[in-house]
Amino acid sequence: MCGACASERRSWDRARAVLRYDKHSRHLVLGLKHGDRTHVAGAFGRWMHRTGSDVLARADLLVPVPLHWTRLFQRRYNQAALLAQAIRSAGGPEVAADWLVRRRRTPMQGRLGPAARERNVRGAFAIQPGRSFAGRRVVVIDDVMTTGATVEECARVLNPRTKAGGGRIGRGSDIGPGVAGRGIAAAQRPGLAL
């Protein structure tokens, strides 16, 4: 996450990264994201569990960033959900894979600038009808965090202090080229991603 992005006020409180996204990690991360290399999710998940252990120890649920159904159909898997399941297998909290949904298809964020990324995901997520995050500490899991726009929008929807909020959220980290998860704790003040 760039310095300018990290200095913005957020609806979430902390982030953890397992890998820095650079020329060395790019192949691994993009292999999971776009190359059907789902076998690396296990290693990333173990790294995420270890790196985010302080956050995960207080979490009730892992919520992977959802894909729109059309992208899920094309890709055949949600890489954030695979990471969340791997964290769970390493001793992490329960995974709520279908509790947050992507209401509309959004263009991929990769080539967008910070402001365009925020606009792109604004209003894209919603809490699945019949699900409640009330009283639960949630860690949002994503595969890559660049500006934090996607996690910010998920956190905004989940955070009870926002108009769109739906429950108490615990925070964790994110997985970028192998990062940890993120979350939001209603009892905690928003802060910088670390």
Listing of model-derived features with the role each one plays in the protein:
Residues 1-141, 147-194:
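Conserved PRPP/pyrophosphate-binding segment of the phosphoribosyltransferase/PRPP-pathway fold
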